[in-house]
Structures are given as structure tokens and as C-alpha cells.
């Protein structure tokens, strides 16, 4: 198998393993159409992780702002290039995912505590 095929195999395994661990905590799998399509792990419609066609995995960063443009919450952003060593690659991704998952709940709590009036905006940050 080419590295490309191997990395897609790794992506599937990592997503399956995370889903097994987190589905009882509200994480769901979303998928685009087609072969080697992007897969997403989401909670309440918020995507925490997605796979890329080239074998990369991204754990996303999202910032929430109140009506005064104060950032009131954020969750972690980590970009993973695939590695031939599955355990190393999976370990990094899972650690980042766990952090994003915990930060998501921390952010939701902070948003509720602030009882912000008006609309809360979300802004997806691009990867540098």
C-alpha cells in the first residue's frame, strides 16, 4: 500500500477509536460523500476534528465573541501531519482531541456564566 492509502487507513482507525471512546459523551460522526471523503467528529453540530484528503487530521479552533467583540471562549487548534508510526500519530491526535473536547465544555460553561445578551458570534480560525 502507498503511504497515501496507509494514511487514509490510519484516519479511519483514529476516527473509529475516538468515536468508540466518545460517542457516549455526545460525539457523532459526519461524513462527506465519495471515496476518501472528509470525516468529521462533532458535538452539537460543532466540528472538533476533521480528516483531510491528503492524510492530515485537524483538531479545530473556534472562538466565540459577544456583541462587544470580546472573545469569551475558544477551543484548541492543532494540525497533524500523518506519521508512518501509527501509535505516535494516533497518540498525538487523541491528546489534542481530548483537549478540544474538554475546552469545548469549558467554553460552553463560560458562555452560560456570562449570560451574554445579544447574539454570540462564532468565528472559525484558519490554520496559519
Identify the residue ranges that each predicted region occupies.
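Contiguous, amphipathic alpha-helical segments that mediate oligomerization or scaffolding
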Residues: 1-7, 96-111
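Negatively charged, low-complexity tracts enriched in Asp/Glu with abundant Ser/Thr
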Residues: 1-38
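Generic detector of well-ordered alpha-helical segments enriched in charged/polar residues
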Residues: 12-19, 98, 102-105, 117, ...
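Intrinsically disordered, low-complexity regulatory segments enriched in Ser/Thr/Pro
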Residues: 36-103
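Short acidic, low-complexity intrinsically disordered linear motifs used
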Residues: 110-128
Amino acid at each position: 500500500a502507498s503511504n497515501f492509502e496507509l494514511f487514509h487507513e490510519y484516519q479511519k482507525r483514529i476516527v473509529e477509536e475516538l468515536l468508540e471512546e466518545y460517542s457516549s459523551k455526545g460525539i457523532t460522526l459526519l461524513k462527506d460523500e465519495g471515496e476518501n471523503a472528509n470525516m468529521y467528529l462533532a458535538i452539537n453540530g460543532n466540528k472538533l476534528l476533521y480528516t483531510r484528503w491528503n492524510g492530515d487530521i485537524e483538531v479545530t479552533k473556534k472562538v466565540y465573541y459577544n456583541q462587544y467583540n470580546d472573545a469569551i471562549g475558544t477551543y484548541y487548534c492543532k494540525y497533524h501531519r500523518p506519521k508512518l508510526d501509527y501509535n505516535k500519530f494516533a497518540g498525538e491526535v487523541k491528546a489534542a482531541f481530548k483537549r478540544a473536547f474538554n475546552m469545548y465544555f469549558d467554553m460552553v460553561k463560560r458562555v452560560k456564566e456570562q449570560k451574554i445578551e445579544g447574539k454570540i458570534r462564532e468565528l472559525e480560525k484558519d490554520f496559519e
